[in-house]
Every structure is written in C-alpha cells, then in structure tokens.
Amino acid sequence: MAKKKSEDHSGGDANDSDYNEEPNFEDPPNFVDNISDDDLLGDMLAQRPSEADGVESVVVVDNIPKVEPVRLEKLKSVINKLFSHCGDIVNVVYPVDEEGKTKGYAFMEYKHAGQAEEAVKKLNNHRLDKNHTFAVNLFTDFQKYENIPEKWEPPTVQSFKVQNDLYNFINDPDAYDQYCVAAETSQNCVQVGFWQNVLPEPNELETRERFTDTFVKWSPLGTYVVTFHKPGVAIWGGSSFQKIQKFPHTGTQFVEFSPCENYLVTYGPTPTGQKIIIWDIRTGAEKRSFVADGMSVLSMFRWSHDDKYVARMGDNSIHIYETPSFYLLDLKSIKIPGIRGFSWSPTDNVIAYWVEEQNQIPARVTLMEIPKKRETRNKNLFHVADCKLHWQKSGDYLCVKVDRYSKLKKDKKELDVKFLGMFYNFEIFHMREKEVPVDSVEIRELILAFAWEPIGNKFSIIHGEPNSANVSFYEVNKGVKPSLVKRLEKKSCTHLFWSPRGQFIVMANLTMGTFEFVDSTNDYIISASPDHFRASEVEWDPTGRYVVTGVSSWKVKEDTGFNMYTFQGRIIKRTILKNFVQFLWRPRPPTLLSEDKQKDIKKNLKKYYPAFEQKDRLRLTRASKELLEKRSQLRETFMEYRNKRIGEWKEQKSRRVMLRGHVDTDNLETEEVDEEVVEFLVKEEITLLE
C-alpha cells in the first residue's frame, strides 16, 4: 500500500523535485580510498572460493618404497592398512614411470578434510622399515610452501626471560619438607595450599583458589605439580608455583610422569575408548598418541628407570618404544604368546613378565634384558590362577605372588572357570646374585596385602581372615631360604605402609581408621596405636620422619581433615578442614652423595648431635618468644577494644537514665532492688477421671 505524501511537500514543483531525487553515493573528485578490501570485507573475503577448494581432503605421501608392478598390490595393501585407521579412503593414486615402477610417492583422498589432517598428524614421520620413513603433507600445503619469500629475514631477537629456579625447594638449609593440601570449595573448583613443615608450626608458602578442577599430583622428583582442567592439564613449579607448561588434552582423567621427568602421559576419554598422549615436558610437544579400546584403561604404559624406554602390553606381545623417537625397539614388537602382565626393574633395564598356562604347558615367569632381549631367567609354575609382580625399590629382589589352585572346575562350554582349594606362593628372585636363584615361600591362608621394605631385605604379608589376620615378617639373605622373623597375630589391619627409609612400618585398617606403628629392629614392638576414624589415606614424608593420615571428602562428607604423627606414632597436629580431599608430601630427588659418603656420615652422626640440639633449642626459644609477643599483642588489641567500648557506654549514660524513668540503675546495689513475682495463666487443661 502506497504511503500518502505529506502536505508539506505538495505545494510546488521545486519541492517535488527535491523530494524525489535519489541520493548520490559517488566519490567526490580526487578522492583517495585508504581502506583496503581486506579491512573492509575481511570476513566475507575469507569465504571466497579458492583454487584449492576440493583438494583439502587429499594428502601426499612421500618416501614410500619404489616397487615393480608385481609387488605393487602388496605395497597397496600395507599402506591402505596404515592410512585407513585415520578415516575412509576414497581414492589412491600411485604415479609410475615408463617401466611401471612406482616413483616413491602417492596421492590419497579421504572422505573429509578432517580425516586428512588426522593422517598427517599421526603418520607423518612414520617409520615403515629401516630405509623408508613417511613424509605426509596436505595437498593444500604446496601453496603455503610456494609463498615462502626468497629473501631470508633474520628473526627478531627476543628479550631474555629469567627462568624459575625449579629446585629451590631442596635448598632449605634445615631440609624442611613441603606438602600440599587440597580442599574443594565448590563443584569442579579445588583450592590448593602449599606448606613447609617448619617446627613448631608449619609455614604457609602459597595458596591458590580454583587451582584445579579435581586433584593435583607431584612429579616423581618433586619438580612439578600437575593440575587438571577441562581443556587439559598444566604443570607448575618454582618458588611461587608459576605455570611452566600446559598440555591440551580435553577431559584428561589421569597422568603419569616418566621417572626422570622428561615425559608426561595423559589419559583422556573418547567416544570409543581412551586416547593416550605422550608429551615432551620441556618443549610441550606431542611425541606420540595411542587409542585404547575401553574406558577403564589407566596406567597402561610402563617406563624404564632411565626414561630410555616405555612399554605397553598388546595381544600376545610387548611393545617397547625407544625415546626420544618413540619408534618400536628394532622396529618390531616382542611376541610372547599368553602374556598376562609385566613390570620394569626400578634400577635396571630388565623386564619381568609372566605367561599363563596353555595346552598343558606350565605358566612361566621370565626376566629379559633390554635392549638385547636376552632372557636371563625362567621359572615354570604349575596350577596358576594369577600372578602379581612386586619389585623391591632398590631392585635387589623381585617377588612374584602366585595364586595357585588344587582343582579346576569348568562348565560345559568352558566359559566359566572356578578355582578350588586356593593357596599362595611367593617366589623370591635374587637379582644381584649369579644366575638369579629363586626361593619360594608357601602360605595356605588368604593373602590380604604384601609390601617390601624399601631399603633393606625384609618383606611383610597380611594373611588370614580380614577381622583377625596375621602379619608375618620375613628376612631374605644370600644363600639361604627366606626366614620368618616375626609374626603378629590377630591384627585387624588391611594395608601395610613402610617408611621410605625402612625399619618402621604402619599397619593400617583403612576401613575402621586404626593404625599401629611398629619398629622392625626392636623386636617388632608396637610403639603406638592411634585412631583416626574413617581415615582413607596414609602418607609418609620422603625422609621417613612423619606420617599423615587423612579423611577425604571423596569418602565421607563430615569430619574431614588430616592428622600428623612422628614415625613412632606420637600425634603432632590435628587439622579439621571442610571438604578436604587430598594431602601429598612433595617428593625429593635422590641424594648426590656417594654411598661411601653416606656411610661416613652415619658413622660419625653423634658428633653432629650437639649442633642439631643447639639449633632446636634456639628454634624453640625463638618460637616461645614469638608466641609470647603474639599473646601480648592480642591482649593489647583486646584492651584497646574494651576501653573504647567502655567510653561509649559512659557517653550514653544520660540517655539510659532518661529511658529508665530518671533512675540511675548503673550503680544500684542488690540490696536496694525489690523483687516482684508476677504470675499469669499460660494454659488450662481438663482431664476426666473415670
């Protein structure tokens, strides 16, 4: 519907012509446009079709073998098998020369561009064999490489940034240890405090709000602490715990550090299973990634003690990768039919693994040297249901806990297997002796826990009924069978925690929250038996001087917190902390002193006692003085507040007298006061008696 023209514009031809004239958008004469099309229409030009459209899903694979036509089909099957893991392949072209021989490269088209990018990410630098390593690039990258300027321009000099001292925590002259305490302030929001265990009261170093979404974890040598977030994980370090590196891996649930802190492994869920990524900690670069079937695959990688190798178990094989290339050792896996478990020695490049029984062939435990792949010891085992491998921390001994059965019962389809008449063997391998002799200890009761003394030659076992178990201590010596040195009967413990320095052990019941502290060199006397109701964790400090028990809000929601004890079980500190979730001592790197120097210090330790005792007295005196000064300051603050309020009370006296009928009640004596009793009816009830 046309709009009626207003009367203001209906009076003359001049007005009509001005009203109907269209506006002029032309540039004035001599106008210079200083705005480029990219600035004005950058978002639209970014969507402009280009010559490369349609080839984003094509990759170029270089350095493939040059083969004759008779071997081409075999080459195609090998390459298709590798590249089909990244997506659906639409077309493959292998250029050939006049004789029909391949030219050493191929063009591969995927269904989607994202699949092509995944192929470049996973298979670039993939080593096919000794002489061929793939170079995989997107077809669209050629344009990028063509536009490289011919004239080299030197990079701009970046200003030097002072790096954090990552090892300042071990420079404390009194060698006080550090620990962190985590408490959940809200959902997916955890506050973490860092403390130094100074006597007589710990010193707070740093507190971070919203530091992590779930929990934290120290690296093996205490250099870094890792935090978890939705986009990935980050590591922090230095005196003020600054961010050192971040690793983007969405939904990371678990991480592992290599023993020397060179690499980090992150585990995160995918729609089909778990994705595992190995990162270089110093550069933040992704070294290799894996996809595992199933959502509960955690800690599937095992590192050698020196970070030279990392291994994982496959179907009837062990895959050992060399660092830093992360290629398979000798470019192939180690085939071991029936393998069920393996573990690295904590001090040597030796792998221990066990194989299940197959077709009347007994189970077997094998020691293998790496990288030679030479088997140094085999031990056959019969009637085996399961095995667990336990290395002593110093690598001197290996204990294999063998679950054995007297009778095997199978159903008709052999899908359900029941083991009857269970008993247990402990096979002790003497790793430092010639030909690795093996001793055996048999126990006919249910095994609840096993633990090696970290430094020493003893191990302990909890066996029997859970509510009335026995704790046995065995000693291992050269040339003789392991001997039972002590048995503590009728103990209600479920876990064993040795001191990192040996000698002392905590027998814990993490169901009831009871603990017993035992000295293994003093006839296994129980020095203390404290309780910490609902405690769910026990943490020794790295020096073996203190023990912490904690009640985490992951287990219960009330009375959460932690207790700190001496190695003899004497309580030092009780801390109640709402929504407490985690307590972790900061690990220490190994000492730089030689064994001879350590022995010399232990031998002459008595001459250091006077200096230590004097320092302790000074510290306690200083602490007492600081405590008295603090109390005096609090008293002065209180008296100042009290006098201020008394002054206000006196200033209000005239108003009080007026409000109280001009009677000064401030100075009334009790004898001048008359008591008046007033009674009134509150409630009346009538009860009929028969």
Curated annotation (Swiss-Prot):
<dbReference type="InterPro" id="IPR013979">
    <property type="entry name" value="TIF_beta_prop-like"/>
</dbReference>
<dbReference type="GO" id="GO:0033290">
    <property type="term" value="C:eukaryotic 48S preinitiation complex"/>
</dbReference>
<comment type="similarity">
    <text>Belongs to the eIF-3 subunit B family.</text>
</comment>
<keyword id="KW-0175">Coiled coil</keyword>
<comment type="subunit">
    <text>Component of the eukaryotic translation initiation factor 3 (eIF-3) complex. The eIF-3 complex interacts with pix. Interacts with mxt.</text>
</comment>
<feature type="domain" description="RRM">
    <location>
        <begin position="57"/>
        <end position="141"/>
    </location>
</feature>
<keyword id="KW-0694">RNA-binding</keyword>
<feature type="repeat" description="WD 2">
    <location>
        <begin position="247"/>
        <end position="289"/>
    </location>
</feature>
<keyword id="KW-0963">Cytoplasm</keyword>
<dbReference type="Pfam" id="PF00076">
    <property type="entry name" value="RRM_1"/>
</dbReference>
<dbReference type="InterPro" id="IPR012677">
    <property type="entry name" value="Nucleotide-bd_a/b_plait_sf"/>
</dbReference>
<dbReference type="GO" id="GO:0001732">
    <property type="term" value="P:formation of cytoplasmic translation initiation complex"/>
</dbReference>
<dbReference type="GO" id="GO:0016282">
    <property type="term" value="C:eukaryotic 43S preinitiation complex"/>
</dbReference>
<dbReference type="GO" id="GO:0030707">
    <property type="term" value="P:follicle cell of egg chamber development"/>
</dbReference>
<dbReference type="InterPro" id="IPR000504">
    <property type="entry name" value="RRM_dom"/>
</dbReference>
<dbReference type="InterPro" id="IPR034363">
    <property type="entry name" value="eIF3B_RRM"/>
</dbReference>
<dbReference type="Pfam" id="PF08662">
    <property type="entry name" value="eIF2A"/>
</dbReference>
<comment type="function">
    <text>RNA-binding component of the eukaryotic translation initiation factor 3 (eIF-3) complex, which is involved in protein synthesis of a specialized repertoire of mRNAs and, together with other initiation factors, stimulates binding of mRNA and methionyl-tRNAi to the 40S ribosome. The eIF-3 complex specifically targets and initiates translation of a subset of mRNAs involved in cell proliferation.</text>
</comment>
<dbReference type="GO" id="GO:0006446">
    <property type="term" value="P:regulation of translational initiation"/>
</dbReference>
<feature type="repeat" description="WD 6">
    <location>
        <begin position="530"/>
        <end position="575"/>
    </location>
</feature>
<keyword id="KW-0677">Repeat</keyword>
<dbReference type="InterPro" id="IPR035979">
    <property type="entry name" value="RBD_domain_sf"/>
</dbReference>
<feature type="repeat" description="WD 1">
    <location>
        <begin position="207"/>
        <end position="246"/>
    </location>
</feature>
<feature type="compositionally biased region" description="Basic and acidic residues">
    <location>
        <begin position="1"/>
        <end position="11"/>
    </location>
</feature>
<keyword id="KW-0648">Protein biosynthesis</keyword>
<protein>
    <recommendedName>
        <fullName>Eukaryotic translation initiation factor 3 subunit B</fullName>
    </recommendedName>
</protein>
<feature type="compositionally biased region" description="Acidic residues">
    <location>
        <begin position="15"/>
        <end position="25"/>
    </location>
</feature>
<dbReference type="GO" id="GO:0003743">
    <property type="term" value="F:translation initiation factor activity"/>
</dbReference>
<feature type="repeat" description="WD 4">
    <location>
        <begin position="334"/>
        <end position="369"/>
    </location>
</feature>
<dbReference type="GO" id="GO:0031369">
    <property type="term" value="F:translation initiation factor binding"/>
</dbReference>
<feature type="region of interest" description="Disordered">
    <location>
        <begin position="1"/>
        <end position="37"/>
    </location>
</feature>
<feature type="repeat" description="WD 3">
    <location>
        <begin position="293"/>
        <end position="331"/>
    </location>
</feature>
<keyword id="KW-0396">Initiation factor</keyword>
<feature type="coiled-coil region">
    <location>
        <begin position="614"/>
        <end position="645"/>
    </location>
</feature>
<dbReference type="InterPro" id="IPR015943">
    <property type="entry name" value="WD40/YVTN_repeat-like_dom_sf"/>
</dbReference>
<dbReference type="InterPro" id="IPR011400">
    <property type="entry name" value="EIF3B"/>
</dbReference>
<keyword id="KW-0853">WD repeat</keyword>
<feature type="repeat" description="WD 5">
    <location>
        <begin position="442"/>
        <end position="484"/>
    </location>
</feature>
<dbReference type="GO" id="GO:0003723">
    <property type="term" value="F:RNA binding"/>
</dbReference>
<dbReference type="GO" id="GO:0005852">
    <property type="term" value="C:eukaryotic translation initiation factor 3 complex"/>
</dbReference>
